[in-house]
Amino acid sequence: MADNMTTTQIEVGPGATNATINFEAGILECYERLSWQRALDYPGQDRLNRLKRKLESRIKTHNKSEPESKRMSLEERKAIGVKMMKVLLFMNPSAGIEGFEPYCMKNSSNSNCPNCNWTDYPPTSGKCLDDIEEEPENVDDPTEIVLRDMNNKDARQKIKEEVNTQKEGKFRLTIKRDIRNVLSLRVLVNGTFLKHPNGYKSLSTLHRLNAYDQSGRLVAKLVATDDLTVEDEEDGHRILNSLFERFNEGHSKPIRAAETAVGVLSQFGQEHRLSPEEGDN
């Protein structure tokens, strides 16, 4: 985020999770209305369907933790989300809803709101996408796999073996692909595994994925947002398998980190996080 940009702090009342789900439901409503107008292209339609599936899954999970009186359907959350957008876009207190009011400072001189002066605050301290450290956050006993002079099949098998030893909880996985002393792929993955009673393991959340090109330059950084959170077990395996398969395609040329980054990004509709030059690599 540029230094001269500002953000408006928002108080979300009953909890950030509820506010986020409701807001994304409002976004879904906008997507659907655009689709009804036949103004949504094919990638947009894919994003609409993906967002709807993720929201339905997340709402189902979230409602289980809420008292029955507070559980809401997707349609109810859509209505609240649209109202939230009015607050955010127009900063209009009359559009506000209970538990969600824009942050303001008391100032009776403002004509739009007798008691408030709408103010933009400098960004809060913390890391934005472009400022994230290259190494994932600290994790106990991180796993590092160095693949030297291995063919693709052996490399894939070694990664699988290492991943299968992960215990429940957060993990960090560093993959270094080294063929004839040429670093052709380096991927850092940070996520959370779940271990099930039957011994089955699943990747519940992908917190971060960094991909580097052959020169060691960072090609792509993924951080945890809702659409980068794996909502079901099979998605977790699909994401990791997409990485493994990069080692097993049998290409004569070294596998590039950019290829892996594009492959993973595309699963989330996040290709725009790569520059055109990186996307062409």
Curated annotation (Swiss-Prot):
Alphabetized UniProt keyword annotations: Host cytoplasm, Host nucleus, Host-virus interaction, Inhibition of host innate immune response by virus, Inhibition of host interferon signaling pathway by virus, Inhibition of host ISG15 by virus, Inhibition of host PKR by virus, Interferon antiviral system evasion, RNA-binding, Viral immunoevasion
Function: Binds and inhibits the conjugation of the ubiquitin-like G1P2/ISG15 protein to its target proteins. Since G1P2/ISG15 is an early antiviral protein, NS1 may inhibit the host antiviral response. Prevents EIF2AK2/PKR activation, either by binding double strand RNA or by interacting directly with EIF2AK2/PKR. Also binds poly(A) and U6 snRNA.
Subunit text: Homodimer. Interacts with and inhibits human G1P2 conjugation by UBE1L.
Region entry RNA-binding and homodimerization, spans: 1-93
Result of altering E66V: In strain: Mutant AWBY-234
Motif annotated as Nuclear localization signal, chain positions: 50-55
Pfam families: Flu_B_NS1
Family: Belongs to the influenza B viruses NS1 family.
Keyword RNA-binding annotated: yes
Organism superkingdom: Viruses
Native species: Influenza B virus (strain B/Yamagata/1/1973)
The record's note on its domains: Both N-terminus and C-terminus can inhibit IFN-beta promoter activation and IRF-3 nuclear translocation.
Molecular function terms from GO: protein serine/threonine kinase inhibitor activity; RNA binding
UniProt-recorded name of the protein: Non-structural protein 1
Chain residue ranges for the region called G1P2-binding: 1-103
GO biological process: symbiont-mediated suppression of host ISG15-protein conjugation; symbiont-mediated suppression of host PKR/eIFalpha signaling; symbiont-mediated suppression of host type I interferon-mediated signaling pathway
GO CC, alphabetical: host cell cytoplasm; host cell nucleus
Localization annotation: Host cytoplasm; Host nucleus
Alphabetized InterPro entries for the sequence: NS1, uS15_NS1_RNA-bd_sf
Gene: NS
Keyword RNA-binding: yes
